[in-house]
Amino acid sequence: MASNNVAQFAAELKMPAGVLLEQLQAAGVQKASEDDALSEADKARLLDHLRKSHGATDGDKRKITLTRKHTSEIKQSDATGKARTIQVEVRKKRTFVKRDDVAEGAEQGQAQVAEADDDAELKRREEEARREAELLEKQAQELRERQERLEREEAERRAREEAAEAERRRAEEEAAAKRAAAAAVEAQQAAAQQAAEAQQETAGAQSAQDEARAAAERAAQREAAKKAEDAAREAADKTRAEQEEIRKRREAAEAEARAIREMMNTPRKAVVKAVEPPKPVEPPKPVEAKGTLHKPAKPAGAGAARPAVKKPAGAAPATTQAPAGAGDRNKKPGGGKGGWQDDAAKRRGIKTRGDSSGGVDRGWRGGPKGRGRHQDSASTFQAPTEPIVREVHVPETVSVADLAHKMSIKASEVIKVMMKMGQMVTINQVLDQETAMIVVEELGHRAVAAKLDDPEALLVEGEATTDAEQLPRPPVVTVMGHVDHGKTSLLDHIRRAKVAAGEAGGITQHIGAYHVETPRGVITFLDTPGHEAFTAMRARGAKATDIVVLVVAADDGVMPQTKEAIAHAKAGGVPIVVAINKIDKPEANPDRVKQELVAEGVVPEEYGGDSPFVPVSAKTGVGIDDLLENVLLQAEVLELKAPIEAPAKGIVIEAKLDKGKGPVATILVQSGTLNRGDVVLAGSAYGRVRAMLDENGKPTKEAGPSIPVEIQGLSEVPGAGEEVIVLPDERKAREIALFRQGKFRDVKLAKQQAAKLESMLEQMGEGEVQNLPLIIKADVQGSQEALVQSLLKLSTDEVRVQIVHSAVGGISENDVNLATASKAVIIGFNTRADAQARKLAESNGIDIRYYNIIYDAVDEVKAAMSGMLAPEKREVITGMVEVRQVFKVPKIGTVAGCMVTDGIVKRSSSVRVLRNNVVIFTGELESLKRFKDDVKEVKQGFECGMSVKNFNDVIEGDQFEVFEVTEVARTL
């Protein structure tokens, strides 16, 4: 958009128009206002002026910055054959400054040298990446060779096992053959012995020779069998040892292969810059790789042969370059860590079976079940071996997590100690000081009871140091009186706005703050409700006020809330100006009003008192000027002063939760100046003032003493009547607010009336007490507390009002869920439920009642409580009967012949037996007959027969008093 005037050009430059006018005048361009036209020549003059003022002689550009980015890719494949791409990105930034012609040649030479250096750097880095890829390829080739070697060893092992098995079978066959041969020899010997016995005489010498030879053969056979068994046993032991050795080697090789695969799959760190080009190192031979094959705890297997790569900034390496002998320098089995391996791989390490590495290079979990934890790092830091005894300052209350943090241990350790002490706790559970100190001592530290750090003391110190000039301020006037006496209408005439028409039912239910400018000065008015329910609001109004205007209707006189307003004013020591309203009515009687006020201790000036009485009419405007004159006169007498150039202090008049704006508070500034952007503290709420509106809804940047404003930006809805303080920083405000929240947490929990064991026992002792649970949501804080107090006053010994929850804002789903759990009725005072809450309430059958007049809410709750009362039982005497004769009837009992002397007797009635006018029995009629016929009722003057249930001691002359019990509904 073209800028044709000063205002548009300032908006385009995003600067205040006043500053732009000053710069134009300094440049010699005469512009008087924001609407003056602005030409291109004027803009050029302004630009030249600004350049000269900032030291620029001409508009030529003498510096230019060039940025260049070069990206290259390197492809490689890992051990699994999966292709991976490594991207190398080089960024260059060059700034050229125009100098004299003499230095241009040298500058060009330096630029060419720098570009040549960059090209050499790029080539060197590409060479490093290529060498890394070659190294990875060599490792993959080495892995394949190891796998082939393992396969060959496995085949050799199987062949040896088969040969051993064949040898064992052959030995068994030989042993069996030898045993068979021995048996045959023994049979031959037996036969020969028999033959020898037959030919003993002729062949004695021959048989002796044969016997000696057989014994020698048997000895030889036993020796051979023993040797064969020993050989078979040795072969089996050797085979088992070889199998165990092969199994161990296979497991070690598999663990190493798994570690190499993890190493290959781990993302590498990008190469940034090396200190000097690495020297090519030959990879280790497979035969010499004993450390990696037999000690599987080594993570990489070729870490000593890898070139060092510089880590990113902030991670200082142990050495800038790892030569071939770097692994021997640390004297650790298995060599050192690879320089290119990232921190995650270092932390993981390699998990192996057993502890074959001697527990040296095992990472964090080297041994079984985490034994021998330590980290093999190249840094020189050594963890302390002795326990550190700390001095722990324990506050009055501390959570388990905070206590563990103070001792620099995990919260689980504190929970373990508490469990050993027999107490089950969670990480967020709060411990008292005594328990926390016992836990600290149990863990071997020194516990010191910390002093209570009360941040409230900072506020007192801040007040003591504040010293500002006291300047006059406008008076704060509170309009008080009985309901419907015309307070708001009177203020409405003063403000010339229709406020009373906007209140539901024509009665004020909110406290309003307005300031009015008169010819003699500014007056701030606080309009308070007159209904009896709003006692707390009137008390807050009297607390913040300087002068009270007591409005009394001339036709109504002094009423209960008028007396209460007088009591509030006297308690606060505030002067009273009496406005006798409605003098335009024919039935007005100002003299009677004066007499009634004198009886209450408010004496008019004409009677020698100190309270001016002004007759006014809010309808016609009569006496309004005199009323303002008297108010300002009282203010002059009081000499009201307050510091202006100081941090603001005030009081929360009203607070509410707006759906679009969040927490909104109406604040009356009592001293200092409140600016937009200040950090305020109101009770347990804090925040920065995001927006500030006056009573008419217009934005304002600041508010001085006695000025009411509406602020936004608080963390929560503050309580009405809370003191508002401006603090220098938000951190201190948050600290004090959290301290106050923790300090009053017990009070807040007590208000929720949780079902504790003690309260349950009390209710059991009280008997059956009906409860009416309610959830109250109001538009502002004052209305909410007024409604709560009014409903709580309705409680009786039989029916009790239970406020489950009360808050400011609309009715939400959480409120409906709470009502479902507590079986409560939701009351919305000038608020509504959103769509989700209404739908949930309909599905759960929750009753939501909306009110905008406090009368209606109180009356309906009162009616509901009346319906919960037990009905009252009343006795109504319906007749009197005289016994004339008594009959004894078998199987029935005594039957009295009676005469109805008064009223009527019904069969369903109850009866009292009177003898000599003394009640001797109370019961029910069992039968009612007339001439042997059962009848429902007998009227006066007729005879009848009657029998009383469970009573036979009837004599002549007794009287029966017949009555009925009726239930009557009770009301509160």
Swiss-Prot record:
Residues that hold GTP according to the record: 481-488, 527-531, 581-584
Pfam hit, one: IF-2
Region (G4): 581-584
The keyword Protein biosynthesis appears for this protein: yes
Bias (Gly residues): 356-369
Domain of life of the organism encoding this protein: Bacteria
GO molecular function term, any single one: translation initiation factor activity
Record-annotated tr-type G domain positions: 472-641
PROSITE patterns noted in UniProt: G_TR_2, IF2
Comp. bias (Low complexity): 105-114, 178-209, 298-327
Localisation per UniProt entry: Cytoplasm
Region G2, annotated ranges: 506-510
Free-text function comment from the UniProt entry: One of the essential components for the initiation of protein synthesis. Protects formylmethionyl-tRNA from spontaneous hydrolysis and promotes its binding to the 30S ribosomal subunits. Also involved in the hydrolysis of GTP during the formation of the 70S ribosomal complex.
Protein name: Translation initiation factor IF-2
